[in-house]
């Protein structure tokens, strides 16, 4: 499989341009980030990475310098056969979200000009849309609007100043969302959800502050913190397209800190990209803040989302497969990390379909310059975020504990994935718990740093963790968003901990992820060492029927499972132990080489 190489991220005029939501438009761009810069022949036909909120600040680049972090020459990437394009259903989904009109039907046009509910293509009439949100009504009396500083599909953002109250004379940013564009119940619900998210998440150091929300007959006004330092993308361009490692680490710690926070609240952003991070000021050490939760959503601990949203260059493979969770945000951060360190996009295509094929099939290039000069730990960090298997991808909390970022002394947050792993462990069979205990004794010291931090964040009592420890830890971090996503419901499935405690050794067995360990280069040594422990402490005679029950498979799997049991003593072989740890299905097992 070859590599996809990046291209210019500059504005282009006469080609397909994906919007901030990943949609391709054939119309010329109306907002050029650097209109004075001539179009390069190399950049012709390159989709623009378009911002939802266009930066109001002038580029620091001199005229004639290509405004792009993409320095790698473009190369054509040919496939042996054209795969089905995922672009069409994505475009359709985005059109529905924005309330675009459906395909024409042989029906009379309603004479009434009032908005009606879009029934998604069903024939017949509809109900009038209720666009009354119940927000405050006196925006004009409290704020004086200034110039426009950004514009997107769903609205525009203006500078404003408070006229009265505690915030008198304070400058703010006001996102103005036109009610005329709310042409479906989905688009109305998107606005309600965005406001609810901003309210719940405001207050974290790296989240844009939410102040208030108002409405009138025509618009919704969301009053937020004004970040005057411009976009992260502009800073990347100002530095010639890439960041030195030491500076990239400082940026990524801030991005991961915010992401770990809203993931713990049960929120998935779904559109993380350099344009959606703003600096509070022009200072080099300015604080970075995440913005634009217009595509974000609440997600339950046992839920997978299936609607395809986001920006093409940053979309995760599982999003294209329509089954994803918070891991999709981590892929986007992996793309941002790649750009920060080398100045190129890891996946490129002339069209959205080509970009998506590249995301699904190609591997990022870590061979060309400047990668040979970048530290091995930095490359490992990026690779573990750009793993196409979402189960092997680091969480935000795990990424903060990665050796590459450890010198930055990032404050670690509780990782909700620990709750899901512990829940599975305490509900597992004794045989599986023995296998995981053996694996925990082979965990590398570098990985133990994360587990030790999580153990202490759960505030153990008398050296152990009870159900109350898990409950109180969630309570300490809870916001209204966590209640909306119903994450505390997982505590109802952890009742066995009401009668016992987990010491640190057993916590490691419960909270270790087999897939995370498999992503490490030393996985073979880890598995071998773990099997040696299992041979001494947990391996026993097991029948094919019992093993099938442990794996939750039927009699059709017996021939396969028989190969996992040693004929000499009836115990699990090394192959059987590794497969048993995975809990893989028969289909996935038989498709892998032995």
Swiss-Prot record:
Annotated PROSITE patterns: PROTEIN_KINASE_ATP (PS00107), PROTEIN_KINASE_DOM (PS50011), PROTEIN_KINASE_ST (PS00108)
Membrane topology (UniProt): Lipid-anchor
GO BP: any one term? protein autophosphorylation
Segments carrying the region annotation (Autoinhibitory domain) are 409-439
- Please give the catalytic activity noted in the UniProt record: L-seryl-[protein] + ATP = O-phospho-L-seryl-[protein] + ADP + H(+); L-threonyl-[protein] + ATP = O-phospho-L-threonyl-[protein] + ADP + H(+)
Presence of keyword Transferase: yes
Residues that coordinate or bind Ca(2+) 3: 539, 546
EC number(s) recorded for this UniProt protein: 2.7.11.1
Task: Please tell me where ATP binds in this chain.
Answer: 149-157, 175
A molecular-function term among this protein's GO annotations: metal ion binding
Q: Which Pfam families match?
A: Pkinase
Q: Where is the composition biased (Polar residues)?
A: 37-58
Instruction: Describe the location of the Protein kinase domain by residue ranges.
Output: 143-405
The annotated region (Calmodulin binding (CaMBD)) lies at 428-448
Q: Which InterPro entries match?
A: CDPK_Ser/Thr_kinases, EF-hand-dom_pair, Kinase-like_dom_sf, Prot_kinase_dom, Protein_kinase_ATP_BS, Ser/Thr_kinase_AS
Name the UniProt key words of this record, in alphabetical order: ATP-binding, Calcium, Cell membrane, Kinase, Lipoprotein, Membrane, Metal-binding, Myristate, Nucleotide-binding, Phosphoprotein, Repeat, Serine/threonine-protein kinase, Transferase
Activity modulation comment: Activated by calcium and calmodulin. Autophosphorylation may play an important role in the regulation of the kinase activity.
Q: What class of enzyme is it?
A: transferase
Q: How is it modified after translation?
A: Autophosphorylated.
Stretches with biased composition (Basic and acidic residues) = 116-131
GO cellular component terms, alphabetically, are:
plasma membrane; plasmodesma
Summarize where Ca(2+) 1 binds, as residue positions. 462
Q: What does this protein do?
A: May play a role in signal transduction pathways that involve calcium as a second messenger.
* Quaternary structure note: Binds calmodulin (CaM) in a calcium-dependent manner.
Q: What is this protein called?
A: CDPK-related kinase 4
Q: Which organism is the protein's source?
A: Arabidopsis thaliana (Mouse-ear cress)
Lineage of the source organism?
A: Eukaryota, Viridiplantae, Streptophyta, Embryophyta, Tracheophyta
């Amino acid at each position: 499989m070859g590599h996809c190489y990046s291209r210019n991220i500059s504005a282009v005029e006469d080609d397909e341009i994906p919007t901030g939501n990943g949609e391709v438009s054939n119309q010329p761009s109306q907002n050029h980030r650097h209109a004075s810069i001539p179009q390069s022949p190399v950049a012709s036909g390159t989709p623009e990475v378009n911002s939802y909120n266009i930066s109001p600040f002038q580029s620091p680049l001199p005229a004639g310098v290509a405004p792009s972090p993409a320095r790698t020459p473009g190369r054509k990437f040919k496939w042996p056969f054209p795969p089905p394009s995922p672009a069409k259903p994505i475009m359709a989904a985005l059109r529905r979200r924005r309330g675009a009109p459906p395909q024409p039907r042989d029906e009379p046009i309603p004479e009434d000009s009032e908005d009606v509910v879009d029934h998604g293509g069903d024939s017949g009439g509809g109900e009038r849309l209720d666009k009354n949100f119940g927000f405050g009504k006196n925006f004009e009396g409290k704020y004086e609007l200034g110039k426009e500083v950004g514009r997107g599909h769903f609205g525009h953002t203006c500078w404003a100043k408070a006229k009265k109250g505690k915030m008198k004379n304070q400058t703010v940013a006001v996102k103005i969302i036109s009610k005329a564009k709310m042409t479906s119940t989905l688009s109305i619900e998107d606005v309600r959800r965005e406001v609810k998210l901003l309210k719940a998440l405001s207050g974290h150091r790296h989240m844009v502050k939410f102040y208030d929300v108002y409405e009138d007959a025509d618009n919704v006004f969301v009053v937020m913190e004004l970040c005057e330092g411009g976009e992260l993308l502009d800073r990347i361009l100002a530095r010639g397209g890439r960041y030195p490692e030491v500076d990239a680490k400082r940026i990524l710690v801030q991005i991961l800190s915010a992401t770990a926070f809203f993931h713990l609240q049960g929120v998935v952003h779904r559109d993380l990209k350099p344009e959606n991070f703003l600096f509070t000021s022009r200072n080099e050490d300015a604080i970075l803040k995440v913005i634009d939760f217009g595509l974000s959503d609440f997600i339950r601990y046992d839920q997978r989302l299936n609607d395809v949203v986001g920006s093409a260059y940053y979309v995760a493979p599982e999003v294209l497969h329509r089954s994803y969770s918070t891991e999709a945000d981590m892929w986007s951060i992996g793309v941002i990390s790649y750009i920060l360190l080398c100045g190129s996009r890891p996946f490129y295509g002339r069209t959205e379909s080509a970009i998506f094929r590249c995301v699904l099939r190609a591997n990022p290039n870590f061979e060309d310059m400047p990668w040979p000069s970048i530290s091995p730990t930095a490359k490992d960090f990026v690779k573990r975020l750009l793993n196409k298997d979402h189960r092997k991808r680091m969480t935000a909390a795990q990424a903060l504990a990665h050796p590459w970022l450890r010198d930055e002394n990032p404050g670690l947050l509780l990782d909700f994935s620990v709750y899901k792993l512990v829940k599975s462990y305490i509900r597992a069979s004794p045989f599986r718990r023995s296998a995981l205990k053996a694996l925990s004794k082979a965990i590398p010291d570098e990985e133990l740093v994360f587990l030790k931090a999580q153990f202490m964040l759960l505030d153990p009592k008398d050296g152990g963790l009870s159900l109350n420890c898990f409950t109180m830890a969630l309570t300490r971090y809870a916001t209204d968003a966590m209640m909306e996503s119903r994450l505390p419901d997982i505590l109802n499935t952890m009742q066995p901990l009401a009668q016992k405690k987990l010491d640190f050794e057993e916590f490691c067995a419960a909270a270790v992820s087999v897939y995370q360990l498999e992503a490490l280069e030393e996985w073979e040594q880890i598995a071998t060492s773990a099997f040696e422990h299992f041979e001494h402490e947990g391996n026993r005679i097991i029948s094919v029927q019992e093993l099938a029950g442990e794996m939750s498979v039927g009699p059709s799997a017996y021939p396969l499972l028989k190969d996992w049991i040693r004929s000499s003593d009836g115990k699990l072989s090394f192959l059987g132990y590794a497969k048993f740890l995975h809990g893989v299905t028969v289909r996935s097992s038989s498709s892998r080489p032995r």
